[in-house]
Amino acid sequence: MKKIAIKIGVLSAVFVLTIILTALLMNSENTDNMGDLDAATLPVVMAEIDGNLVNPMFGYRQQMQVDFSREGLTPIDTIRKVKIAVKPFDQKIQSLSYEIRTSDGREILENQIIKKLTKSDGYLKAILELKSEKMRMNQEYSLKIQLDLESGPVYYYTRVIQRSGLNTSRYVEFVQGFYQKCLNKDTASDLADYIEPDNSASSSNFTNVTIHSTLDCITWGALEPQMVRTGVPVIREINETTGSITLSYQISAKNTDGGTELYEVNDFYRMRYTQERVMLLDFQRSAQQVFDPTLSVANAQGLNLGVVSKELEYITNPSADIVAFVQTGDLWSYSQSASKATKIFSFRRDKNSDERDDNQQHNMKILQVDESGDMDFVVYGYMNRGPHEGYVGVAVYHYSSTQNAIEERVFVPSTLSYEFLERDLQKLIYVSENNQMFLLTGGKLYQIDIEEQSYQTIQDYIEQDCFVVSSDNSHAAWTKEMDPYGSTEVTEIDFEQARTRTLKADSGQYIRLLGYMNEDLVYGFASQKNVQVDSNGKVTFPMKTVKIENFDGTVKKQYQKEDLYITQANLSETLLEMQLSEKRGNTYVYKTTENIMNNKKAVEESVTQNTVYTERRGMVVRLDFKQTVSNPDPVVLTAKVKAMENANILDMGVEPSDEEAYYVYAKGILDSVYSSPAAAVNRADAMTGVVLNRRQQYVWERGNKKTKIKLNQKEIPDAVLDAPLSVKELQENLGDFASVLDLTGCTLDSVLYEVSMQRPVVAAIEGGKSLVIVGYDAYNTLVYNPEDGKTSYMGMQDSTEAFEKAGNIFISYIENMK
């Protein structure tokens, strides 16, 4: 018996040991392939102007489309030398070369290899001497700098422009002095001379500080911040009159417990230089606090996120116990019951972080969070570090809460810059339960099979005005003809089911998309003969019927009113507002407004977003839970990254549409895109911005109009001097020489910019006649009359009134790049 007992004991011990070893081996297998994102490796390149470093350029591993990569603007003088400084970050640079292209990227004007780099203050410096005789004044060009590293080539992009009378150094030095002075109230008193405080700006919101904020708010109130990382100015726009610069930097502040808070700050400055000093025309600052759960962020009410924009993306699991949110480029998950905060994804490193890690040209979208805390999400934009460092694209990830690890499922690279990619993805990105991803990019709608690593194009060309998406991105619809007021057929898609349906207008009618109410499509019908376009280009689309219909074809609501037409419809999440008009002859006269309310019952949210005023930080954002938060100090975890066994890269080779578009840039960012140059000019005027066309030529600039000019009529094409009021006719007569700009609906003051840029403007006057504006001064316009061939002055006020009476019909052109 004793031997049997010993034998049983030995076998039991062996069994237990086997279980332990097996568990250890399995755990090793589960953790050996997990780690962190690899550190950033690529150098940073900057331009140098009069000893000041400007326009930091981050490296790309693939060549970008220069007409969709609008980086900083580097002014050059008549000598046409560009000084650059390379911050190598221990990388060995084997060679440096550069290439000058036209702004649309179609023609290479020059390429050279730089044989000599000099070392200075930790930088490698070089001088690029641009020699191409094809470069013209006042025209942007793309400069691509190529560094050859041991790991392969890396590309850097900036824009260059040759203009006279610029005050670049004065603007740069003003910005550097202004933001530094803001950190020290003792030296900030003279800043009061530059700002314009009034009641339009909040004095307690550090996420939205403007030129109209108080001096106390501009100098950070009671926050008492310290500089962590200084900023390098980025020149966005500059001309003989004004300059616009953005600046990104980091500050820190001590909380009441002595903990250190970190803030990402973005400044925008628009300036004009007079003979005496720099004048500040506009100033905006946004500070965003980096979330740090070690700073006692949880209290009885909820989770204090600190100084952050109210446009915060967050989503909960079904029971609302777990909330996921994106803050300053970091993705976090907070579990109330487990009192646990997990950093799911971040390019920012906890220690030894530098400007490459904190590059803000990326964003995230949370797709879903399940009950256990597992999460699907998308990271899109420039990849600061990791396996796709230096690439722009869309990465789909899955987070496992049990393993506390993320796994990349697919990466779709793009040659569009972050701001263009974001514009598309903000409109639509959706991943179904069947692992089908639908996204809008480059003006096309794609379906990607994540498991099969394959894709197909659902719709080859999409006009923004003809494409609508439901609030949860699960449905979308577009018109067949891609004409918002001239389409007869609509296609709607259910992304979860990957099914489409078609809606057709009856013969003699047009169909118009209005949007979505919940997941129901809202659209209307109008008789083709009733659709009108006035002299200002404004379209009247009088609908007799408006329908609200789900994907299965069930009409939830059909609205029509006898003898009245719906001439305008405004749709929000909760309300469809319709303006009803009566037809009198060929015009429609407004009668009344009627509304259709969203009858979907509001779901009571268990997690809500609120703002709270604090003495030191001003307005802060808090996520409030329905249940009281019991533990103020959550456990803090950081998710690991699963190593990829195979490269999950799906290169779709997206080529943007060649259709003409007009881009409005304002306050340092891409503000909007229009198909109409007139609409773009009006928007840029309101936003104090600029307009560029598809080829990145300046169509219009706010504040860069000469005080007077007189064009040489001998240099004006005869097709323009004939003063046709038909855009089509003028384009046919100009041929490939130029592209016509229909500026109907703009003000006279706006279109005089075209004259200032040596582009005459055809203007309508009463009686169906027209004139050509060939010059102006402070008091008059100079107009050419095609009927008698004479040129005469016309008072500015008389000109304004005459053109307004004729409907402000203006037509100009811009020479095509050769």
Feature roles, as predicted:
Residues E110-Q112, F283, A341-D350, A405-S414, ...:
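Beta-propeller fold detector
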Residues A39-E99, D104-I108, E140-L223, V297-K340, ...:
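Core segments of small alpha/beta cavity-forming domains
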Residues Q464, R501-L513, T554-S572:
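Conserved blade-ending motifs and adjacent loop-strand segments that build the rim/top face
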Residues M1-V16:
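N-terminal Sec-pathway targeting helices
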Residues K710-K818:
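Conserved active-site-adjacent core of cysteine acyl-enzyme catalytic domains
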Residues Y141, E237-I251, G373-V379, L521-A526, ...:
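A short hydrophobic beta-strand element
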Residues V14, I20-T31, D67-K83, S95-Y123, ...:
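Surface-exposed, charged secondary-structure patches
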Residues G390-N404, V490-Q497, K538-G553, M597-N598:
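Beta-propeller blade signature
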